[in-house]
Amino acid sequence: MSAQDKLIKAQHLIDMNDIIREGNPTLRAVAKEVEFPLSDDDIILGEKMMQFLKHSQDPVMGEKLGLRAGVGLAAPQIDVSKRIIAVLVPNPEDSEGNPPKEAYSMEEVLYNPKIVSHSVQDAALADGEGCLSVDRVVEGYVVRHARVTVEYYDKHNEKHRIKLKGYNAIVVQHEIDHINGVLFYDRINAKNPFEAKEGMLILN
């Protein structure tokens, strides 16, 4: 039984045991493109990946399943070397603690996503990045593009082109790196981890 066959079983909920960690060769491989029209198996896998992210962000389900909260997941992280990523970025509460009008600023499963253009300006998160596949803290600015245009297909086999900036752009670039065999710390300057080149945007 393949990893995907196990993951898409009706009763299976993806948990931390399904997520492979650094050192596993799948994380360093360039993942294969999915074929269209999408197979039921690939559609279900995408739905299971999104379900994991929702569970991970839910305090009750997250604790019950022992999950680390995540905003993105790539198929290679669950040992499936395919170009599928799921992104779930919640909107924050307002200054008075009221819930946002829209729960998520991005909620999408992207098949065969690719960056087709990007800004000259770089950006990095002030607090650095983490990863569900990396069980240690690696400090430093993860240098990425401040703005990207991404093409992808959805589960209905429809093609989309979206422009992203800020945190959403960072998250999508992190996940696209996974399908290209790249981990976030590859983008940290080893000699000077907190080097901020002129014009680089630091996102809080």
Swiss-Prot record:
Biological process (GO), any one: co-translational protein modification
Alphabetical list of Pfam families matching this protein: Pep_deformylase
GO molecular function, one term: peptide deformylase activity
Domain of life: Bacteria
Cofactor remark: Binds 1 Fe(2+) ion.
Residues at the active site: E175
SUPFAM superfamilies referenced in this protein's UniProt entry, alphabetically: Peptide deformylase
Keyword terms of this UniProt record: Hydrolase, Iron, Metal-binding, Protein biosynthesis
Cofactor dependence: Fe(2+)
Reactions catalysed according to its record: N-terminal N-formyl-L-methionyl-[peptide] + H2O = N-terminal L-methionyl-[peptide] + formate
Enzyme Commission (EC) number: 3.5.1.88
Residues that, per the record, bind Fe cation: C131, H174, H178
HAMAP family, per the entry: Pep_deformylase (MF_00163)
Stated role: Removes the formyl group from the N-terminal Met of newly synthesized proteins. Requires at least a dipeptide for an efficient rate of reaction. N-terminal L-methionine is a prerequisite for activity but the enzyme has broad specificity at other positions.
Family: Belongs to the polypeptide deformylase family.
Protein name: Peptide deformylase
Organism per entry: Streptococcus equi subsp. equi (strain 4047)
